Amino acid sequence: MKSIVPASWLAFLALLLAVADVALADESFILATGRRDPRIYAIDFNAALKPRNNNTPNAIVSRAKVHPDRLDGTPVGDPANIVLSEDHRTAYVVNHHGAVNNAEFLQHGGRGSISVMDVGRMLRPEFDNTDRAVERNYDSGYFGAVGLVVLPDLLLVSHSENWLTEDGSNRISIIDRKTGGRRAQIEMALGHPGHACPDFPVPFVSPTPPPTVPFEAPDPRFGCWPNPEFIALGHGSDGRTYLFSGNAGTDDVSVMDLHQALMGAPVVEIAPRIPVQTGPFGIKASPNGKFIAVTARESGQADFEGNTISIIDVDRARTGAPGAEAARVRVGTDDPNGQARPFTVAWTPDGRQIIVANYRTNNVSIVDLRLALAHDPRAEVARIPVTRPADADGLVRPGRPKGTAVTSDGRHAVVSGGPRLDPTAPPSGTVWVIDLRTRAVVATVTGVGNDPYGLTILEDRPD
């Protein structure tokens, strides 16, 4: 079978797993997705830290549209995730439902898209609220796009939905970065113990009738389709790289052979899936690639939200050995039955701590890896509340944290959040900066999108 990528991806993956050890640059920026507000918000990091800018939008330098407007002037797009290229000159933005008008599209299962954006233009105030940063847009290859991994020449894009439904996906697309063409597609196995699945072939062959799937969660019929959410790359002691996905539909984590996927093989899961507390969402590899942290966000089958993160041992997972879930840590709440809805995770550069955004309990957890692997109940070493000032209507709404990132010097965590409001409402999202030494919020930026999800930190402004 002919490979669909050059050998350069191996060198890139080694670089990806290396830990950066540089100081935060003077010109550093936070790039936050606006989600229901289809723009990327560029925030001056150091301006955000100035006390006079706290609880204001003053540190926002520009807002870049992710799609050209409709001909009638309506803004479109649904940016939920953002990842930078190797040289940080290009941003790849995942639009969960593609070029939709969020005031019209009020359900799941929109066709995903990728916005390719010039980072330098995203930072220029004169291009505020324009599409001047958009270089091109292309189809993501399926429905409900969310997870994204950047490889040399290629993108891996996971999809958690099917056409106009919240259930029904088992697809991860492999997209050509230059042309936007779909070069291959990973097809994941259906089902998990106790859940019968329709007679639907994997890999797919035509003609096959479309499956009947639940419209939206919660629904007890969830459990057949994995519905992969975020994805991450882990590094085995065998020198190979493995793709992990958090499967919201089947409450587990898949491990896949990336090399086989890049050779064009559609079926690449190589070991039994690892069950977690409930449907996972955010997933991230440790800086050395040996561990995968994943959140247990919510069940698709019942009205239940999780309160744990799982730490997956890559070597045990890839070999199917017992104990692949090396640790499970309760976060966000002291109540074993409490519902925290952990959303995403980020690692500190030294790999010692994991930052967790807990949506339902409106706080951010810090988990110590060493204590977690020792099954110490004190592994959650800090729990930091995040709050918001009043919105334009005078109401003080919960923080609802979602996205997470950590600066390369390990000093600060950055968290995005905020409630989902009517798409016509003024920007209501929030970005918090947390000092990881004092474990306290040191800056709050307001007016960042509507229900913002993913974000990233840019520490070397392109020329």
Go through each PLM region and give its residues.
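Predominantly soluble domains enriched in secretory-pathway, periplasmic, or organellar proteins
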Residues: 21-463
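Positively charged n-region of N-terminal signal peptides that target proteins for export
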Residues: 1-7
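Bacterial N-terminal signal peptides
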Residues: 8-18
